[in-house]
């Protein structure tokens, strides 16, 4: 199969994988007349060495290493030209995965069309992968189309796993009508009865929308079905929803019913729902009791359970208890993750102990736990809130030179602090650095900077900043305009007023 030209006919039929294919990702260009080959003294035998046969494994390996979609197609085509070679599920899967990741959707459609006439056995997982990618691109009709193609191309009835995957993607995207169509189709056309996983997705949907009563009705229907039964995931979802609606008493009762009446043992995920729920409600001591209950009943807490409790202590300002929990994690031999470290760092910074947070960052690096952008932003915010903007600027430069990935939020934290602390000269210089790196401040921040510059007697600089943002299409707020015009009029520099009017007109 070879993609040879640049225009694809969607209605064209291909009879076998030996026919030439049309590449939908090649755009038509005027073909240049090929240059004559350079003169060479090398013999024909030397210039045309025997090509090594590309096996399915080699084709898969080569395509996985190639990032460019056209390059992947070229490898796919080259393999198909070999005598006796027919592509299989593995090679098609890698090709389609690359194309859908690069949003070459026309190419994906063309290949799926060809697959209808292939004789090899395709696996359901190929279509599930396409569903996930189409869902990320908000192409929800295509998600349904991939589900329907399982029967057409793989020539098997979609499994309950396929229905669960498709339903979950549609529900998470808020596509209720498509979800309903899917369930009706599965019931009437495929004769499939919903399993626990499918029921759990429906429970999650109602909980997400705040319809807790409907969620309980789904659970009752699950019990009546005699086929599917609620599990720890079902109850965890319901309890999380109850906690979110400040119904902690009912959440605890449900937790007790799950154990005593249903005989379902809670797992670390269920316990985490309880810990997080109590922490959100400010009942951190009850959250700690849940952790103690876990240990007494042979369910060892994991990193996420400890992190949730630390976060709860931090929220109510109990930094010492958070530190004790942190030390307990280390004693158990568990390796704290980025979330755990960042949680405690944030606690230190909010308590005005940024130096302790920086020590913790050093410990984190020593333990080979990789800090993320949020971790660094916590430190920057801590330094800035303590009026240590110079150190924050130094850290920003140092981390940048070390290859640390910082986002626009990192820069905005420092600019906000400089404005709030009245360090206007530094703020203007830092604004220049940001613009050079293609990062723009938050709308409220640069408007505040303009106002502060004008109020502090730096009208000319304020005007330049305002005009600069106008030129890149950002619209100043009323306060900025008012501050600039008022300052100009006070200083009787009407030329600037006319410049502003010119900026508005243009």
Curated annotation (Swiss-Prot):
Pfam families: PPR_1 (PF12854), PPR_2 (PF13041). Residues 28-48 are annotated as: Disordered. PPR repeats lie at residues 88-122, 123-158, 159-194, 195-229, 231-266, 267-301, 302-336, 337-371, 372-406, 407-441, 442-476, 477-506. Keywords: Repeat. InterPro entries: Pentatricopeptide_rpt, PPR_P_subfamily, TPR-like_helical_dom_sf. Coiled coil: none annotated. The keyword Repeat applies. PANTHER family: MITOCHONDRIAL GROUP I INTRON SPLICING FACTOR CCM1, PENTACOTRIPEPTIDE-REPEAT REGION OF PRORP DOMAIN-CONTAINING PROTEIN. Belongs to the PPR family. P subfamily. This is Pentatricopeptide repeat-containing protein At5g18475. It comes from Arabidopsis thaliana (Mouse-ear cress).
């Amino acid at each position: 199969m070879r993609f040879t030209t640049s225009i694809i006919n969607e209605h064209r039929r291909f009879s076998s994988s030996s026919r030439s294919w049309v590449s939908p990702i090649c755009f038509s260009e005027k073909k240049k007349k090929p240059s004559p080959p350079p003169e060479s003294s090398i013999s024909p035998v030397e210039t045309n060495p025997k090509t090594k046969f590309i096996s399915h494994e080699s084709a898969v390996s080569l395509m996985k290493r190639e990032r460019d979609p056209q390059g992947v197609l070229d490898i796919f085509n080259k393999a198909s030209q070999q005598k006796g070679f027919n592509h299989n599920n593995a090679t098609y899967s890698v090709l389609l995965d690359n194309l859908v990741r690069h949003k070459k959707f026309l190419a994906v459609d063309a290949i799926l069309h060809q697959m209808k006439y292939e004789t090899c056995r395709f696996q359901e997982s190929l279509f599930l992968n396409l569903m996930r990618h189409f869902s990320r691109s908000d192409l929800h009709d295509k998600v349904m189309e991939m589900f329907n193609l399982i029967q057409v191309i793989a020539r098997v009835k979609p499994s309950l796993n396929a229905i669960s995957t498709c339903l979950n993607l549609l529900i998470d995207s808020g596509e209720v009508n498509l979800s309903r169509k899917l369930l009706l189709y599965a019931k009437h056309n495929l004769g499939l009865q919903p399993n626990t996983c499918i029921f759990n997705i429906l429970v999650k949907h109602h909980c997400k929308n705040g319809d807790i009563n409907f969620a309980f009705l789904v659970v009752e229907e699950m019990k009546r079905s005699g086929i599917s039964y609620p599990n720890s995931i079902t109850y965890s979802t319901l309890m999380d929803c109850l906690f979110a609606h400040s119904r902690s008493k009912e959440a605890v009762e449900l937790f007790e019913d799950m154990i005593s009446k249903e005989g379902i043992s809670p797992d670390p995920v269920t316990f985490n729902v309880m810990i997080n729920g109590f922490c959100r409600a400010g009942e951190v001591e009850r959250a700690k009791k849940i952790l103690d209950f876990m240990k007494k009943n042979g369910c060892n807490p994991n990193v996420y359970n400890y992190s949730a409790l630390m976060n709860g202590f931090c929220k109510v300002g109990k930094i010492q208890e958070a530190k004790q929990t942190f030390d307990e994690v280390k004693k158990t031999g568990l390796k704290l993750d980025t979330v755990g470290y960042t949680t405690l760092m944030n606690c230190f910074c909010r308590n005005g102990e940024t130096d302790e947070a920086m020590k913790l960052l050093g410990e984190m690096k020593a333990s080979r736990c990789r800090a993320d952008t949020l971790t660094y932003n916590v430190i920057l915010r801590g330094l800035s809130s303590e009026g240590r903007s110079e150190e924050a600027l130094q850290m920003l430069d140092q981390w940048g030179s070390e290859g640390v990935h910082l986002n626009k939020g990192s820069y905005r934290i420092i600019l906000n602090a400089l404005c709030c602390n009245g360090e206007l000269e530094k703020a203007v210089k830092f604004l220049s650095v940001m613009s050079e790196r293609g990062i723009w401040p938050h709308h409220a921040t640069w408007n505040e900077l303009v106002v502060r510059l004008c109020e502090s007697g730096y009208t000319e600089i304020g005007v330049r900043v305002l005009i600069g943002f106008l030129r890149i299409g950002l619209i100043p707020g009323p306060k900025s305009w008012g501050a600039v015009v008022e300052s100009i009029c006070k200083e009787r520099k009407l030329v600037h007023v006319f410049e502003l009017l010119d900026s508005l007109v243009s």
